[in-house]
Amino acid sequence: MAAKKLLILPGDGIGVEVMAQVRRIIDWMGRKRKIEFEITEGLLGGAAYDVHGTPYPAETLEAALAADAVLLGAVGGPKWDDLPFDKKPERGLLGIRKDMGLFANLRPATVLEALADASTLKAEVVSGLDIMILRELTGGLYFGQPRGIDTLPDGTRKGYNTLVYTTPEIQRIGRVAFDLARKRNKKLCSVDKANVLECTVLWREEMIKLQKEEFPDVELTHMYVDNAAMQLVRNPKQFDVMVTENMFGDILSDCAAMLTGSLGMLPSASLGEADAQGKRKALYEPVHGSAPDIAGKDMANPLATIMSFAMCLRYSFDMAAEADLIETAVKNVLKGGLRTADIMQPGKAKVSTTVMGEAVVRELDKLNA
């Protein structure tokens, strides 16, 4: 079996220390499951700017395109707040997503039994929650042209962005969403604002057409984005798979993230088009940011990044058994009462980033025995 090519981009802030714990899991997979990984490490975001004067060096893109999958820690921080817009760390992340053709962002929002009380909502509202939010990643309001800030003849200024989608862009994200729904519970909710925005009228029309022509076995419903935000808080378990536009998905997935109690628990995957062999370019990253306030203090929760690697095994390497093993190990560690600061509960044991990573490795040993 050929070695799996992984590009690791620790990034900024806590990205470095949480990625160190993922390296433990990767090493364990090599030793105990005999999976060979060929690992390259690169720079992205503020760390790249400090070395190269750009948040997105050419060699990082080259390495990403050569890899089977990319693992990212986090980018950004106040250190780089005053940089020009095109030099900010976040431009590196947007750039690599665009150049890798990563159009489908998968954001699971799952409430583990041990953490049902950690949510800000009542346990009975979120217990057993398992939602997959699919966000279109390379079109919509974040990338549409024209965009900019202009100074008008009278001296006032005008800022503008454009919401644009084409039929092929909608169809490709739709197919990923319907396929995910088909593999889960055959329920898909498409979120738009078709009562106001013509672009999302087209979105809704294309989703309906796709369902009729290619996915008649999947139940398709539609919801306006403002109602979807309300329903995620009111009755989140009504949803299974949700699909939506770039900005809507950015907002709704963060809303859904807090149903689980902590951003430190949530992984994500960004996928590109399937090639002739069915393989996709892919980038995996935790939902949380770089958390500069706790960076370097061994306090960060590494579980979202570890679970992102589990998603990598599942979606890029077709290793569902190994992905399940990691997810079960994480569940068991939490059942055992270990908590990082962000998910700390009364009566539980508060541990560091390093100790949490070590605990997951020990649990993997038990499960693999």
UniProtKB/Swiss-Prot annotation:
Residues where Mg(2+) binds: 226, 250, 254
Similarity section: Belongs to the isocitrate and isopropylmalate dehydrogenases family. LeuB type 1 subfamily.
UniProt protein name: 3-isopropylmalate dehydrogenase
Alphabetized GO MF terms: 3-isopropylmalate dehydrogenase activity; magnesium ion binding; NAD binding
Cofactor: Mg(2+); Mn(2+)
Subcellular location(s) per record: Cytoplasm
Keywords assigned by UniProt, alphabetized: Amino-acid biosynthesis, Branched-chain amino acid biosynthesis, Cytoplasm, Leucine biosynthesis, Magnesium, Manganese, Metal-binding, NAD, Oxidoreductase
Main location: cytoplasm
Pfam family, one: Iso_dh
Annotated positions binding substrate: 97, 107, 135, 226
Organism for this UniProt entry: Paramagnetospirillum magneticum (strain ATCC 700264 / AMB-1) (Magnetospirillum magneticum)
